[in-house]
Amino acid sequence: MIASAPSPSTIRWVMVTRPAPDADRLAAQVRALGFEVVMSPVIKVVWRGQVPRLAGMAGLVFTSANGVRALCHHLTVIPADVATLPVYAVGAATGAAANAAGFTNITEASGDVETLAARIKADAATLGSFSGPLLHVAGTQRAGDLAAHLDRVATVERCVLYEAQPCSSLMPAALSILKSDASAVAIPLFSPRSARLLADQFHRAGCVAALGLVIPLCLSEAVAKSAHAAGFSHARIR
């Protein structure tokens, strides 16, 4: 049994669990802070589906940066009339991806579906109503039911353009560090699903004890709750 939580001052390693290209950007930021990085993704992103007709859409909704990348992959070039549509991004990283893709009218929420829905409701109240449906570019997995939050406020058409497939195993370098010095490892976590998938990897690798030693740094309360439920003892919101 762990007597107390590991101290942040003991952290040497940061395990980056995001898929590329997010992993590379995060790793660079972590190294700039003086920590060592070990890569071990929990998911890989696969493109799928087709983009529906965009004419008549009143706006676009992205609940991850991967949604932005998926749309760009399918369209190759974002048409000018699409680039100027209102874009609702779940958080800053997704908003930055939309900006980099060429979208010019971006509203960012605070990292969860609830605040995203609140931003859309506020615009609906200002406008009176939207001129057409909102296209939600999404993956096969949903963190929340956006359409239910916006019932009677806006029509949301969900378009699945990517799938975040689980990676079954920890990378060998990550496993070695977890087995030798897990209390010196911090792990940024960005979604409830990522927390669950990472815990599954720990179990499959036979390093269950590390669940009580590593420090998960969670994007939100929802992520922290999922991490705690999955067995991580020292999850913190960062």
What is the predicted role of each segment?
Residues M1-R238:
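Signature of uroporphyrinogen-III synthase
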